[in-house]
Amino acid sequence: MKRRAHSLFRGISRTSRNIIKLCFLCVFSLSSLMIQAQDNQRISVDLREETLESVLWYLQNRTKFIFMYATEDIANITDISVRAKDKTITEILDECLEGTNLTYEISGSAIVIKKRKTDKITISGWIRDTSGEALPGATVSVRGSKQGAIAGLDGHYTFSIPAQEGLILTYSFIGMEKKTVKYTGKRTINVTLNNSSNTEIDEVVVTGYQNIQRRDLVGSITTVKAKDIIMPSYTTIDQMLQGRVAGMVVTNTSSRVGTAPKIQIRGTSTLLGNQDPLWVVDGIIQEDPLELDATSLMTNDLKNIIGNQISWLNPADIESISILKDASATAIYGSKASNGVIEITTKKNTTDRLSVNYTSNFIIGTRPNYDQFNYMNSKERVLFSQEAFNWGTPYSAEPIKQMYTYEGLLNMYLSHDISSEEFLAQRNVLETQNTDWFKLLTRRAFSHNHNLSVSGGTNKYSYSASMGYSKSEGQEIGNDSERMTGRLAITIRPVQKLTINAAINGSVNTNKGFAGGVNPLGYATTTNRSIDPDVYYQMKASYPYNEGVRSLSYNFINERENSGSKSASSYLSASLDLKWNILDWLTYQFTGGYSDNNSTNEAWESERTFYIAENYRGYDFNSVSPASKEFKAALLPFGGELFTNNTHQYSYNIQNKLQFSKAFNDENRLNALIGMELRSTTNKGINNTVWGYVPDRGEVITSPTTLQAFEPITGSQNSGWGILQRIYDGGWRKVNTTDNFFSVFATLAYSFKNRYVINANVRNDASNRFGQDTNHRIDPTYSFGFSWRASEERFMRKYVGWITNLNFRGTYGIQGNALTRLSPDLILNQGTVADLYNRYQSTISQIPNPTLSWERTKSWNFGIDLELFNLFNMNLEYYTRRSNAIVELDLPYEYGISSMKRNGGIIHNRGIEYTLTFTPIQKRDYALSVSLNASKNWNEGGHTDIEVKASDFLNGRSDIILKQGYPLSSFWSSSFAGLNGQT
């Protein structure tokens, strides 16, 4: 049936109908004008990091438009930043929705937000650094949306998104520069990220066992780049660390070139154990210096040169150094890390084209001179001695009569051995002598260093090789050092998920210096300038087998020319690192290393030296006849003394680690590691002292005086003749020890919402060195830490955005320390045949102590990290440590030994550290940074049941004295009660 249409204007007159139509036309025209006016309305917007829904509500409240959308379509779109001035609504919406899968339609006063109808595309690829290493946890995101992916442990990523025009991808990783890539239709996109010069929060920290983002660590760790501390005047990295890290004290103990400095981190935690930090290179622990049997000729300088743990390492091969200071950072290294850990990371191979690099430098130092010191000249020195005599200042002993010192000259005059004319004439000679000891004994130091490196490779393999040579002529004449280093490293990636790194390192070192009693710089700074350098003046001396010896002739230049020391060492190591990315979140890593270290050392004093005359002869060289009584009382009438040391140390280190790393989103991350480590170190050495050594006659050995021919002068002491037996037996000693270690460890780091971080570490070292109690054989070390990054809170970013980083952290942990050559059992030294019994003899070295246990240190650490305007960076830390130290207890002589070691001392350390860095210029290729650091450590003894005798305070044993409430290594003296009025 056909429907009939009804007119709306039926029943109305034509005139009325025309009026109504005209009204409708006016209303429609007015409505169109209003809609066009709204669309052309211009507004200003300034919003940062808001959700899309918040932006739409903001626009709706400031315009006449109503927005309609499905909540699920816009729920995941956040971090919208819009900054517009006098722009239309369409311009603002275009900017807000750019890079998303959303579009909009305007219908009257309504704006509808809806999804685009597009097909999906899948994008995948690899994210690596410049050396070709995978960047697990790196993110790729679509600009303007939450879409994207997180790279797995092998650096691979994949995700699907709706196809759209102008798609822009952003790749980022902590410590790396962000990279943006415009999508051009290519479904596989591989990206290489460059290192960033950004602030500390963006760093990746190398702890030795793992690499982890700075923001996920709670412990006290300072990382420095090797390129920032390289100084041409230093040849080893330990010297370059001086003054660079708060809480770490680097002390140069000698002016001799090649000598390792003493390094101490956060005070002293042990009295009798090793106080040096643990050195780790590419995750492999470097063994302690070789233990030597020091003699009078074996100076500490030479021992430090021999025993430097990283003397083989060329600073040019180093990428970065991490200093681990608190328990949270060091607990993973167990019983060897109570003094802190210094972790060195060497440079990685790059996948660039062939590159050849050569660097060299030449350094000329200054020679010391008297203008630098407020020292007296000869005339002032003579005047001072004259005034001291006139004031009646007593001498500690009668001056030796001689013409070469004012005191000796005056004694001769007062004894009427010379006339007044002779006295005045010689005094004038002394006043005008002005010997320049600095000119005679020192020189301008000169050194030159050369480094050559070659590197290159592809994505499948890469390689690098380097050689270094350095030579240093020390400030003291006669002190020289020379070193050659070499390194070869290769990286192979046979498949995408497997990376193999192998390296070989080698070095050769030689050093020439002085015997024990020869110190040119010390002599120059303390010796009277009125002394003629060519004369042999009389120096106080004694000889036990001739009571008439009061002095012997001494000349420093003669002493230097007829004695000396030299050392030569070689080092070779090989390492293998295999990393297998089993899953995107799971990696297995094997690390193995082997090292071989050999050294040969000599120190000697010839028969022409004061040292031999005083200790073995009793008279000056060639000053008596063979028939004289002085000759017959000499232990060593001919020849000098030669000390030799040959050592061989080899060790291996095997680690197996399984690492879990999962980023659940941009804000939550979990890192976990479990592993085991097996280490073994073998030390072999021979120390030998030979008497009768004549270096200037073909290095022959002459025979000492026989026991039958030895005739001490009447009235002299007759004890100590056993030195003849030692001379004939020789000082031969052999060392052959092997130390094995087995450890298991685990770490955990969880970051929640990029604001709350929890760290936990545990390690268990087993040893049968400590007691029969099984609880003492195991040393579990553990730590816990928590941090709150307040700057990531929304209210902080909104109201105080100029605070770019604010982090509060605290840690607690327990560390252990195992003293070497210490046992709970009875130790006997098996000696040679005793003449009295004609049987082998043994002596007690250590009595049993079944309760002996590890030294343990409990540590608290609190820190604040603050960064302002991306320019100022401040770190403030406070720590406190309590150590249960092993001390030495004196024993009655009936025990057969004078002392024993036992647990019983408490050491307290507390301190504050402060670092301020200002970086006004920070570009990709260059930066300007100024840094200031300061620290203060207080230590004192706690409760101890060990009694300290008065003699211990006054005889120079301050390094082992532990007195409650007083600092360690204090200077002690008797209190002055005043003058006795009765006397």
Where do the language-model regions lie?
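Residues on the lipid-exposed face of transmembrane beta-strands in outer-membrane beta-barrel proteins
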Residues: T346, Y358, L452-G456, G486-I492, ...
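Hydrophobic, well-ordered secondary-structure scaffolds
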Residues: D301-K303, T737-V762, R769-F770, T774, ...
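Alpha-helical support elements that line or immediately flank enzyme active sites
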Residues: M298-N300, S575, Y594-D596, L866
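Surface-exposed loop/interface segments of Gram-negative outer-membrane beta-barrel transport/assembly proteins
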Residues: E200, R215, Q275-D276, V281, ...
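Metallo-beta-lactamase
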Residues: L59, C96, F786-M796
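Hydrophobic beta-strand positions in extracellular immunoglobulin-like domains
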Residues: I127, L193, L578, F660, ...
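Residue-level recognition of beta-strand termini and adjacent short loop/turns
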Residues: N76, G108, G144, G185, ...
